[in-house]
Amino acid sequence: MSRRTEIDVRPITEAEFPDWNRALNTGFLRPPAVAEEQLEARRNEFVPGRSLGAFDGDRCVATFRSFDQELTAVGGGLVRADAVSNVTVTATHRRRGLLTRMMAQDLAAAKERGDVVATLIAAEYRIYGRYGFGPATSMTEWAVDVPRAGLDPRWAAPEDGGRIDLVDGADVRRLGPELHERLRRAQPGAVSRTELWWRYRTGVIDWNGSPWTEPCYALYRSADGEVEGMASYRTDDRWGDAKQPLNTATVDWLLAVTPAAERALWHYLCSIDWVQTVKSGWRSPDDLLPHLLPDPRAARITTQADWLWVRILDVARALEARTYEGQGSVVLEVVDRGGLTGGRWRLEAGPDGASCAPTTESAHFVLDVGDLAALWLGDESAVRLAALGRVREERAGAARVVDALLRTSRRPWCPDMF
């Protein structure tokens, strides 16, 4: 067993990728060895300098990967993000500070590049707060009891003059990216997708080693013929003992840029013959789905959890990138144990724009950089955090001022796992 000081944390070379991938699979409790085809598919994600490994001798025992991403702020502003993924530490090498070393190295490089934030989807809640991340969006999954929903079983087409067609993977790759761009530029919390995302999700590339099964793809066009919505879903072909259909339609993803498209796609999914249950996939916690049904109680929440975590790397640029419905000012003291963006900042904000600059004035509101991340996209409440003792008012009423500036009328949402 090597001494802890001998474990080397560094960017991997392309030649080390197979060993890095073995360590990644081990950390995720998957079979360590994979077929050569799957390994080659995973190489598509390799970017020199952005995949880190911890090496005990010549064996990789921890993994970390990041890549360039854009995140949509409140109001539609796009900020540069360092997306963190593939974080593992082999069970034999835990509690040695390997993740801390990899995270520090990556965040320092992201700060140097000029990234405004870092992002990740946290597998475990208690890990990432220590690095300045905070839960900035959440997600909800619903299961719809179709017979109870109250929709007309004779439904055959959208009432608005639009239409729904079933398409194939080539159509999804052709039409999906532009549709997603329209959605994500209007949806705070949404992130950019690469061409690889679409190739992975339509079976062009085998990225997880499982046999590819083609899903169904439903496309919504408005009465004017414009593509405004798309969904990918699978059915399970399940029947009961009395020869009654008990099928479930599970949604992989659903994109809609208008309420009409969203309504039409959900109504279509809930009208498929033999389908008794529709599982929604990852949706916004204030998604319209339940209220698109005559009986909203037919949509039962099955999962509700934090989703996208954000680590602010530049307080001023992050706060200036978003819009504000209210008018006001507040002096924030941001505590950053990572030393990347702490300090005291005066935020002056209103509907016409915002400025955020360092100040020597007395603080009105003191908070950790992770809690600022939770507030930044508007999903969390400063008053709520104050009640929990996680933030501190230095001026009475400061939490209400922060909420008046940062809270939003619709909640942020990230549709993606990465």
Swiss-Prot record:
Pfam families noted in UniProt: Acetyltransf_17, Acetyltransf_9, SCP2_2
EC number: 2.3.1.-
One GO-annotated biological process of the protein: aminoglycoside antibiotic catabolic process
GO molecular function: aminoglycoside N-acetyltransferase activity
Organism domain of life: Bacteria
Record key words, sorted: Acyltransferase, Transferase
Keyword Transferase attached: yes
Annotated catalytic residues: Y128, F418
Binding site for acetyl-CoA: V87, T88, V89, R95, R96, G97, L98, L99, T100
N-acetyltransferase domain: residues covered: 7-158
InterPro entries (UniProt xref): Acetyltransf_17, Acetyltransferase_Eis, Acyl_CoA_acyltransferase, Eis_dom, GNAT_dom, NAcTrfase_Eis, SCP2_sterol-bd_dom_sf
Keyword Phosphoprotein tagged: no
UniProt xrefs under HAMAP family: Eis (MF_01812)
Protein family membership: Belongs to the acetyltransferase Eis family.
PANTHER family: N-ACETYLTRANSFERASE EIS (PTHR37817:SF1)
Quaternary structure note: Homohexamer; trimer of dimers.
Protein name: Uncharacterized N-acetyltransferase SCO4186
Record organism: Streptomyces coelicolor (strain ATCC BAA-471 / A3(2) / M145)
Upper taxonomic lineage: Bacteria, Bacillati, Actinomycetota, Actinomycetes, Kitasatosporales
